[in-house]
Regions:
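Membrane-helix and juxtamembrane interface regions of eukaryotic multi-pass membrane proteins
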Residues: 1-138, 150-166, 171, 175-218
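Structured ligand/cofactor/substrate-binding pocket environments in proteins
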Residues: 141
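Acidic, glycine-rich loop-and-strand cores that form catalytic or ligand-binding grooves
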Residues: 144
Length: 218
């Protein structure tokens, strides 16, 4: 996990250094971007729907402290796919660097992509069932819309609902932390409490960065 994150950060540094010294506007990768965004929309929507189906079958509710099955772990397989999808998400940074879209290569972007991968490695090893289902549903839904936006942006720059996408992302973080606060406040021990506390702090940082981006952009 650490090796992959280190490789990602190395690419960001070295790739930026090299591309800024090359003449021209960078590579376009229209065909690859076209296919990539379609694949992401399909993958994210699948993970969202699959998690919802599992939640319904297992009788999970929106009230936190759902059953955590250590052995069967019905959510584990889709969480593994969710975790691996974060490797695919590194392509977002690849496109930004190779296209020289420097305005998009922000601290928020790099922080999000590097830390989310590490954080869900922890989930995959400790919080692989139960209440993690809600995160996959919310994140899968938001990313389905986000990659739809990226797909549309390949063809037009006039996308009126861009700011609403950012608002939805912040609502997602709010919902995640409501869940975390409930888990911590209720004394629920089915989902690892230490992981929940780390989750809460991390999501607060993400909400703050997205809120700052929203204020600066809109």
């Amino acid at each position: 996990m650490l090796a992959i994150v280190a490789a990602y950060l190395t690419f960001v540094g070295v790739g930026t250094f090299v591309m800024k010294r090359l003449p021209g506007d960078g590579f376009r990768f229209y065909g690859l971007s076209f296919v990539y965004n379609i694949v992401q929309v399909m993958l994210c929507s699948y993970m969202c729907i699959e998690s919802l189906v599992i939640a319904l079958r297992q009788g999970y509710t929106l009230t936190p402290c759902n059953t955590f099955d250590v052995v069967g772990a019905p959510v584990a397989k889709v969480l593994w796919l969710f975790y691996m999808s974060k490797v695919l998400d590194f392509m977002d940074t690849f496109f930004i660097v190779m296209k020289k879209n420097w305005k998009q290569l922000t601290f928020l972007h790099v922080y999000h992509h590097s830390t989310i991968f590490a954080f869900y490695w922890l989930n995959l090893n400790a919080g692989y069932d139960g209440d993690i289902f809600l995160t996959i549903i919310l994140n899968g839904a938001i990313h389905t819309v986000m990659y739809t936006y990226y797909f549309v942006s390949l063809h037009t720059r006039d996308i009126w609902w861009k700011k609403y996408l950012t608002m939805c992302q912040m609502v997602q973080f709010g919902c995640m932390n409501v869940q975390a606060v409930y888990l911590l406040g209720s004394g629920c021990t089915k989902f690892p409490p230490r992981l929940t506390a780390m989750y809460f702090v991390y999501i607060v940082s993400m909400f703050g960065l997205f809120a700052h981006f929203f204020v600066q952009s809109y």
